């Protein structure tokens, strides 16, 4: 009887550690350079969309339309919290609150992160603001340069 109870407690503890580790990994994966999906850019009339998320969760947005005009190029402090963890899917949902409001984005929105595909969707109330893919090369290059600068 006690051995079954202890086994269940150990299993529960292992599950909690596993869930926490995966959520922490997703938060770390969120950091880095993201670029706009070509299909999304074409449908939305944009030339480029870049998002850089720093380790302190400051977000740098750069959005350029097809005419080459900068619609948005700004650094915005963001509060990013893990909203929902889906255990059986590689999708994480993060709630984002921007300290400075910009006309192209609502003050609060969600990051939907699919770490298996390296895809990030910025959405609010089922309205998609951007579809982005992780640029692992630019992320690694930025981390390497930062090491040598500091």
Swiss-Prot record:
Coarsely, its chief localization is: virion
* Signal peptide as annotated in the record: 1-23
Q: Where does this one sit in the cell? A: Virion
- What keywords are annotated for this sequence in UniProt? Signal, Virion
Question: What cellular-component terms does GO give this entry?
Answer: virion component
Q: Which domain of life is it from?
A: Viruses
- What family is it from? Belongs to the asfivirus EP152R family.
What is the protein's name according to its record? Uncharacterized protein EP152R
This chain's source organism reads African swine fever virus (isolate Warthog/Namibia/Wart80/1980) (ASFV)
Tell me the lineage of the source organism.
Viruses, Varidnaviria, Bamfordvirae, Nucleocytoviricota, Pokkesviricetes
